[in-house]
């Protein structure tokens, strides 16, 4: 994902945690808060309890890719933090992971019905 579409600083993550709402999707948790911008930004958290660096990085890469593919359908104007809750995210089939991410976004109400949105995620 391009830099403009990512949360980068600890303050940005803390603001989403403080001002946003939380949705539980089993192996994945989602925090979302409005950001008053014309685009949505995403951040990814993989706690150390999920395993070593290789496992955590694999989870983060896979979740980031699932979000990148769904990004054109995300409603602009949200900061969204995805929190991994299970080491199984490193091993489940990618279509299953995509469905999990999509379900979390739908529960949060930040997913548009059509896929007319931002593109060129690179």
UniProtKB/Swiss-Prot annotation:
This is Ribonuclease P protein component. GO terms for biological process: tRNA 5'-leader removal. One of its GO terms (cellular component) is ribonuclease P complex. It catalyses: Endonucleolytic cleavage of RNA, removing 5'-extranucleotides from tRNA precursor. NCBIfam families: rnpA. GO terms for molecular function: 3'-tRNA processing endoribonuclease activity; ribonuclease P activity; tRNA binding. PANTHER family: RIBONUCLEASE P PROTEIN COMPONENT (PTHR33992:SF1). Its EC number is 3.1.26.5. InterPro entries: Ribosomal_Su5_D2-typ_SF, Ribsml_uS5_D2-typ_fold_subgr, RNase_P, RNase_P_CS. The keyword Nuclease applies. RNaseP catalyzes the removal of the 5'-leader sequence from pre-tRNA to produce the mature 5'-terminus. It can also cleave other RNA substrates such as 4.5S RNA. The protein component plays an auxiliary but essential role in vivo by binding to the 5'-leader sequence and broadening the substrate specificity of the ribozyme. PROSITE patterns: RIBONUCLEASE_P (PS00648).
